């Protein structure tokens, strides 16, 4: 019985445990669901709450007010209903209200007590008093009266009081009321405006324009600010010389874009009216445009005055890149009512609407740093940050030799200014400009209509601010003229401030007179261009001699233009590289500033020169490429049959003696080697591109192209990055590219070719070992000859004989390889006679009559036989020509004169005999990539720079440069291979 009970008990325990586990798991799941739900709640705003609800700033939702309560004006707490007073107030909504008794229905202004009101109640349940009276609820000691009283303020002489704005006490009337009407009222015939009282007996204009003009939008707005305060401000400034009123009047003129129209009495016309009326007063700080008690708004409207202000007097201080390199701009700031706020430095983004770190914002005032800042800001942010405009008078602070501090006024060029309805400041001639002084950034007040508490209909924003600093010509100490602040405003018609935005830009640019630099560049271009013409004429004359044509025809003119394009490309390249290095070295290395970088507009001529250099170099490159893939070439096989063999004759059933055929494989082998060296270069193109990119992007040489004085290769991410100068980018890129290219060429010539591999000389050796010579004509009567005739008589031999022949050569047991006995000269430049060329062409016509050798196997037997006969005929003719067999087409060998080598032309004309010029420099490489490395290197460099100047991206430029290198290499290989197969009868299928 006991044994049976224990299992049942155990089963019961397990069942209970399982149920408990399931319950706990379910609770956890429900808790997780509950926790997930509390992360989301309804979105409510204070204005969506009901009248009997307030907005709980903790729960961010609407909550009900207590009994006899309603929400306050802000909507974040509760107040008692009219007729109820507070008996408890713990702040916010925690109040308790109690109804006032019937005999005391009024509530005191503080809301804590009930009081009897003899003159009735207001809508809020407070006591009401007639006009000119103040409400008295307590006696002098502060005790509450049983009944409120209304006391009349004494407006008579000796008192001149009236209720204050709250109606709680009597205050003295505004002085203009007392002075004008000897009372606190301003009745006819006096004029009351803007809370002031003026007499109408003066000569102040009555017809005022309170309309704000928005030229960009083509509309006008009836500004409530101007309606309320323009006349009063102008009158107070005119009649009383009130300082703040005069400042406020000046602010209104600035808000109206400093525009002047002689036919309307707007803010600026009123300011000029007051300004002219103060002509008898002394000028402030000896400035004729700054009258006493008035702000300095204008420089005057005399023609040419702007040019004098900006270009006549240098600042009495100097700047450098190493010491005093900060522009200390300060601003006198005023509020819209004309009150002086404070002196403040413009650092920290005072004039910059775009947000950024203080370090980057302040970089705008580092001397020599070209600054550019752009952003897009929502109108809602501008309205929130600038509810009222702040006005600035900008000055440059400097110290003299004895460390006394002075201010230099900064003129403003307002592009929105209209003078008699003309935008004079948008004219290209500075003689027509009208300079001003005061600026603001955002005006959200003048665009308010009917009520100053309304959202403005139009907002005016300074969307473009540019500070121009010009260097004094020929200065050595960093002297500058007066900086110019150019500002342009945009008028935005507000539809939805949260969805609308405006683009803002702030820039600081430096300029100097580039006339001398342009003149020097033009002189260099003229001199070098003249030398290029002379060089092209010599090349054309040499070409005419090499083609054996004395006539000047259209082909000659075209050839001259092609040569001139190549030489002129070199001229432009030299000038642009020299110009770029000049700016890079002199700008970055100077301490006392004497030069400043050209501005982007001034760089256009330089960019044009680079474009011309690239276009002409591309034309030269294509000219050379086409010349290389159309050369005439033939491989002369000197191998002779070694004997005769018996050969079966088809169709005759017998045998006969036949010459042992010479193997064609040696010719195929030489042809393949020639095909391989067609695009061999003295540099590695991929290494060139990658190394250049490494130094520019990784090492940081591209930072030298920034338009700032720093020469550091590394920049912190927290630092401001100035825009790039296209001239400096070009200078840095060309310098690095040329240095890497020259280092590669020197390494290739001094080390690689000496100790590892020299493909050009190896090819000449291969020709000798293969018993094959190369006859090459790059022009009709000019070309190259590689003498490959074996000194051993035969090259088609076994390994043992080949090694023995090499040993005999090494031990000088045989004759030398040269064409002339007992010499080593194997390479020659050849100038062939016209007779020899004609004979060559007759044989060559038979050789190339078919459409290339690629279809040898599919050709008919007769055609193949004719081609083979033509090949043997050409081989026999050229071999006999080299062996002086044809006396009528003989040749002689000589050395070229030094002047001939320098000019690249031949003075002697091969009339009767051809001329072989000894050529130890292997100049036959000029028909290969190898001999045109300078052209290829400069072409690749110019391609790289043109792409970078277009897109400002070294990575993209590197990729596209390598891509074009590979494309042209493929074209050169493919077409050159087809030409080789066509001219030599080597089947293209054997060129691997």
Curated annotation (Swiss-Prot):
Residues 1-35 form the signal peptide. Residues 668-676, 677-685, 686-698, 729-754, 755-759, 760-768, 924-926, 927-933, 934-949 dip into the membrane without crossing it. It holds the Pfam family Meckelin. Its main location: membrane. GO terms for molecular function: filamin binding; misfolded protein binding; unfolded protein binding. The keyword Cell cycle does not apply. It comes from the Eukaryota. Residues 546-555, 629-667, 769-923, 983-992 are cytoplasmic. InterPro entries: Growth_fac_rcpt_cys_sf, Meckelin. The keyword Transmembrane applies. Residues 36-516, 588-600, 699-728, 950-954 are extracellular. Glycans are attached at residue 242. It is a multi-pass membrane protein. Residues 37-280 are annotated as: Cysteine-rich. Disulfide bonds join 49-62, 65-78, 80-97, 100-114, 117-127, 129-150, 153-170, 173-184, 186-197, 237-246, 253-268, 354-375. One of its GO terms (biological process) is cilium assembly. One of its GO terms (cellular component) is ciliary membrane. Homodimer. Part of the tectonic-like complex (also named B9 complex). Interacts with DNAJB9, DNAJC10 and mutated SFTPC. Interacts with SYNE2 during the early establishment of cell polarity. Interacts (via C-terminus) with FLNA. Interacts with TMEM218. Interacts with WNT5A. Interacts with ROR2. Part of the tectonic-like complex which is required for tissue-specific ciliogenesis and may regulate ciliary membrane composition. Involved in centrosome migration to the apical cell surface during early ciliogenesis. Required for ciliary structure and function, including a role in regulating length and appropriate number through modulating centrosome duplication. Is a key regulator of stereociliary bundle orientation. Required for epithelial cell branching morphology. Essential for endoplasmic reticulum-associated degradation (ERAD) of surfactant protein C (sftpc). This is Meckelin.
């Amino acid at each position: 019985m006991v044994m049976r009970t224990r299992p049942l008990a155990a089963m019961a325990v397990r069942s209970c445990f399982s149920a408990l586990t399931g319950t706990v798991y379910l609770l956890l799941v429900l808790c997780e669901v509950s926790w997930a739900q509390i992360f989301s709640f309804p979105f409510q705003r204070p204005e969506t709450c009901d009248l009997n609800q307030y907005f709980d700033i903790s729960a961010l939702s609407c909550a009900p007010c207590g009994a006899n309560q309603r929400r306050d004006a802000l909507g974040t707490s509760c107040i008692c209903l009219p007729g109820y007073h507070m008996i408890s107030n713990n702040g916010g909504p925690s109040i308790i209200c109690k109804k006032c008794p019937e005999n005391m229905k009024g509530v005191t202004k503080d809301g804590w007590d009930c009081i009897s009101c003899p003159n009735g109640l207001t809508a809020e349940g407070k006591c009401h008093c007639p006009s000119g009276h103040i409400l008295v609820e307590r006696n002098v000691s502060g005790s509450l009266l049983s009944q409120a009283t209304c006391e009349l303020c004494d407006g008579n002489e000796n008192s001149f009081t009236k209720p204050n704005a709250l109606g709680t006490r009597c205050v003295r009337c505004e002085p203009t009321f007392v002075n004008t009407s000897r009372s606190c009222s301003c009745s006819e015939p006096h004029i009351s405006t803007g809370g002031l009282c003026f007499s109408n007996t003066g000569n102040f204009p009555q017809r005022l324009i309170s309309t704000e003009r928005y030229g960009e939008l083509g509309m006008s707005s009836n500004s409530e600010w101007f309606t309320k305060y323009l006349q009063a401000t102008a009158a107070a400034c005119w009649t009383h010389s009130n300082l703040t009123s005069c400042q406020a009047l000046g602010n209104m003129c600035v808000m109206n874009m400093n525009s002047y129209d002689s036919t309307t009495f707007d803010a600026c016309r009123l300011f000029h009216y007051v300004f002219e009326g103060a002509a008898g007063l002394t000028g402030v700080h000896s400035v004729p445009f700054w009258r006493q008690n008035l702000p300095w708004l204008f420089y005057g409207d005399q023609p040419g005055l702007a040019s004098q202000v900006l270009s006549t007097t240098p600042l009495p201080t100097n700047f450098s890149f190493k010491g005093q390199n900060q522009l200390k701009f300060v601003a006198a700031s005023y509020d819209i009512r004309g009150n002086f706020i404070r002196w403040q430095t413009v650092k920290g983004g005072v004039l910059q609407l775009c947000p950024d770190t203080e370090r980057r914002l302040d970089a705008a005032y580092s001397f020599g740093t070209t600054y550019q800042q752009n952003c897009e800001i929502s109108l809602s942010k501008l309205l929130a940050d600038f509810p009222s405009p702040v006005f600035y008078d900008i000055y440059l602070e400097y110290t003299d030799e004895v460390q006394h501090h002075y201010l230099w006024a900064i003129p403003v060029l307002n592009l929105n200014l209209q003078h008699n309805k003309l935008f004079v400041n948008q004219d290209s001639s500075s003689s027509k400009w009208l300079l001003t002084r005061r600026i603001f950034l955002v005006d959200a007040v003048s665009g308010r209509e009917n009520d100053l508490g309304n959202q403005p209909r139009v907002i005016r924003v300074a969307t473009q601010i540019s500070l121009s600093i010009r260097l004094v010509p020929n200065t050595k100490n960093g002297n500058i003229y007066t900086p110019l602040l150019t500002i342009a405003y945009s008028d935005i018609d507000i539809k939805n401030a949260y969805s609308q935005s405006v683009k803002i830009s702030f820039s600081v640019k430096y300029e100097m007179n580039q006339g001398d630099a342009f003149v020097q560049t033009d002189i260099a271009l003229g001199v070098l261009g003249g030398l290029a013409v002379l060089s092209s004429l010599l090349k054309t004359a040499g070409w005419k001699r090499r083609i054996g044509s004395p006539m000047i025809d259209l082909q000659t003119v075209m050839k001259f233009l092609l040569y001139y394009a190549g030489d002129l490309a070199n001229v432009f390249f030299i000038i642009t590289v020299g110009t770029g290095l000049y700016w890079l070295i002199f700008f970055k290395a100077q301490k006392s500033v004497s030069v400043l970088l050209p501005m982007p507009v001034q760089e256009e001529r330089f960019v044009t020169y680079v474009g011309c250099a690239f276009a002409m170099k591309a034309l030269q490159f294509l000219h050379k490429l086409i010349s290389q893939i159309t050369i005439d070439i033939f491989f002369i096989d000197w191998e002779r049959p070694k004997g005769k063999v018996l050969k079966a004759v088809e169709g005759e059933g017998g045998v006969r003696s036949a010459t042992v055929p010479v193997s064609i494989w040696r010719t195929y082998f030489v042809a393949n080697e020639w095909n391989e060296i067609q695009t061999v270069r003295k540099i590695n193109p991929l290494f060139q591109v990658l190394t250049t990119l490494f130094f520019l992007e990784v090492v940081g040489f591209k930072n030298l192209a920034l338009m700032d004085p720093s020469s550091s290769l590394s920049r912190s991410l927290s630092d401001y990055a100035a825009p790039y100068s296209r001239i400096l980018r070009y200078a840095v890129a060309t310098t690095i590219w040329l240095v890497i290219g020259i280092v590669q060429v020197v390494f290739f010539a001094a080390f690689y070719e000496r100790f590892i591999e020299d493909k050009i000389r190896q090819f000449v050796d291969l020709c000798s070992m293969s018993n094959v010579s190369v006859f090459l004509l790059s022009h009709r009567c000019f070309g190259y000859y590689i003498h490959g005739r074996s000194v051993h008589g035969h090259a088609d031999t076994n390994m043992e004989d080949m090694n023995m022949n090499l040993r005999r050569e090494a031990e000088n047991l045989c004759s030398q390889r040269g064409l002339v006995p007992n010499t080593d000269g194997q390479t020659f430049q050849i100038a062939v006679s016209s007779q020899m060329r004609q004979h060559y062409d007759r044989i060559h016509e038979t050789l190339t009559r078919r459409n290339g050798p690629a279809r040898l196997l599919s050709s008919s037997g007769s055609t193949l036989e004719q081609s083979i006969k033509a090949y043997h005929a050409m081989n026999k003719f050229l071999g006999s020509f080299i062996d002086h067999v044809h006396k009528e087409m003989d040749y002689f060998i000589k050395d070229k004169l030094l002047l001939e080598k320098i000019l690249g032309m031949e003075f002697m004309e091969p009339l009767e005999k051809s001329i072989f010029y000894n050529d130890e420099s292997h100049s036959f490489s000029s028909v290969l990539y190898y001999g045109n490395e300078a052209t290829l290197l400069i072409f690749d460099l110019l391609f790289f720079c043109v792409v970078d100047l277009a897109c400002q991206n070294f990575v993209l430029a590197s990729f596209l440069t390598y891509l074009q290198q590979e494309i042209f290499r493929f074209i050169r290989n493919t077409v050159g291979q087809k030409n080789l197969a066509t001219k030599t009868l080597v089947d293209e299928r054997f060129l691997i």
